[in-house]
Amino acid sequence: MKVVFLDRDGTVIQDPLDERVDSLDKIELFPDSIEGLKYLADNDFGVVLITNQAGIAEGRLTEDQFWTIHNEVLTQLAPSGVTFLKTYMNGETGPNATEWRKPGPKMLLQAAEDLDLNLEEIYMVGDNQSDIDAGINAGCKGGILVKTARNKVVESPNAIYSAPNFLDAAQYIVANS
């Protein structure tokens, strides 16, 4: 099975100005993310969502609210025929965060175990250095930085590719797999 690990906020959906997607009205899909997800699906790639949700630890949303928002994202993607194989979420933040929070590798390692994946064949795609580092820490093929997020990193010395948007990242993945 060909799979891509993908961050959500700032990669698939726009980070709001206050930097947390903590309500349904803050969901804004990037148009190119839908195209990129379709492109991957058309080329027989499955997508596993790997997302940090610090808003839970900060008390800005509950885990139930996260899943309500996530289900709305899936509803908005459904007309395009796009879905995710599985979603892994970590709501920790700060000095007490465990290896489950990116850049820690635990969510990626768990996904590989659950879905019987070879990490050396998988790209981790995201808008933040922690996404790239999580892929490296888990032993993935490489990390791809998508330069779409507000107030985030625009270059990563550890990324094997920097893409202006997710569609470009998807095209790179298909061409290099």
Feature-to-residue mapping (PLM):
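Active-site neighborhood of HAD-like aspartate-dependent phosphohydrolases
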Residues: 1-46
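Asp-based, Mg2+/Mn2+-dependent phosphohydrolase catalytic module
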Residues: 2-4, 8, 64, 68-83, ...
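Gly/Ser/Thr-rich beta-alpha loop segments that engage phosphate groups in nucleotides
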Residues: 12, 57, 61, 128
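Histidine-centered beta-alpha loop that forms part of the nucleotide-sugar donor binding/catalytic region
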Residues: 15, 52, 148-149
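Short acidic, glycine/proline-rich loop/turn micro-motifs
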Residues: 16-21, 59-60, 156-157
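Sparse recognition of residues in long alpha-helices and their boundaries
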Residues: 25-26, 49, 82, 151
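Substrate-recognition element of Asp-dependent hydrolases with the DxDx(T/V) motif
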Residues: 33, 37-70, 84-96, 135
